[in-house]
Amino acid sequence: MASENMTPQDYIGHHLNNLQLDLRTFSLVDPQNPPATFWTINIDSMFFSVVLGLLFLVLFRSVAKKATSGVPGKFQTAIELVIGFVNGSVKDMYHGKSKLIAPLALTIFVWVFLMNLMDLLPIDLLPYIAEHVLGLPALRVVPSADVNVTLSMALGVFILILFYSIKMKGIGGFTKELTLQPFNHWAFIPVNLILEGVSLLSKPVSLGLRLFGNMYAGELIFILIAGLLPWWSQWILNVPWAIFHILIITLQAFIFMVLTIVYLSMASEEH
């Protein structure tokens, strides 16, 4: 455990606290006494999300600038494989015409993968540095284990769904889709509106909560192993779970990307 003075419950609770900023006073929030207000943001989630997004841009830009027509290096080959895989997925699932979808899918896949990958760092490494070197009261390093991050990304996808629906069908067509399906009669407009509204709103909610739930559970298992077992025996469970978690990390990034493509493809269909 990170501290001999902590009980397992204290240790687990400490690692589930975000570093928060109170926007009313622009001061850090005490995790032991959080204010009952909406005006707080998880600045650790924002920081790592932005840093990992910039890392993605820098890595891919550097590879693009150094790309050659000859024999590529190992890193360039890996990047090209990822790009080819994402591009193939877009061609298979998106049947409209848009230059935005493939770059969007690539960004989502790599960005979510990098955020998920933070879960494989030693559970106490960055929080220990933050507490003892920087004097921060709390730190969580997995942005995708924060429901605010995953729902914010899902909200961005939802806005694109609305944009493509209105762009391809027009305001009138989009309105008819909400009010005259599945029952094509004016008397069923209220029922149709409820059914289609729930169906539409469930897309971003399920998209965000699915990623959050899987990553939060994975993070919690690492914390439980570190908090409840002696340090010399943690590797017995940590190593197998970390190996299995690599699959979860990749799969969740892939699922988020695929559902985004599918939802945008459905929105782009002309009726």
From Swiss-Prot:
Key component of the proton channel; it plays a direct role in the translocation of protons across the membrane. Keywords: ATP synthesis, Cell inner membrane, Cell membrane, CF(0), Hydrogen ion transport, Ion transport, Membrane, Transmembrane, Transmembrane helix, Transport. PROSITE patterns: ATPASE_A. GO terms for cellular component: plasma membrane; proton-transporting ATP synthase complex. This is ATP synthase subunit a. F-type ATPases have 2 components, CF(1) - the catalytic core - and CF(0) - the membrane proton channel. CF(1) has five subunits: alpha(3), beta(3), gamma(1), delta(1), epsilon(1). CF(0) has three main subunits: a(1), b(2) and c(9-12). The alpha and beta chains form an alternating ring which encloses part of the gamma chain. CF(1) is attached to CF(0) by a central stalk formed by the gamma and epsilon chains, while a peripheral stalk is formed by the delta and b chains. SUPFAM superfamilies: F1F0 ATP synthase subunit A. One of its GO terms (biological process) is proton motive force-driven plasma membrane ATP synthesis. Changing residue 214 to H: Completely defective. Belongs to the ATPase A chain family. Pfam families: ATP-synt_A (PF00119). CDD domains: ATP-synt_Fo_a_6. Residues 61-99, 167-219, 263-271 are cytoplasmic. It is found in: Cell inner membrane. The chain crosses the membrane at residues 40-60, 100-120, 146-166, 220-240, 242-262. Residues 1-39, 121-145, 241 are periplasmic. The keyword Membrane applies. Coiled coil: none annotated. Its main location: membrane. It is a multi-pass membrane protein. Changing residue 217 to H: Reduced activity. GO terms for molecular function: proton-transporting ATP synthase activity, rotational mechanism.
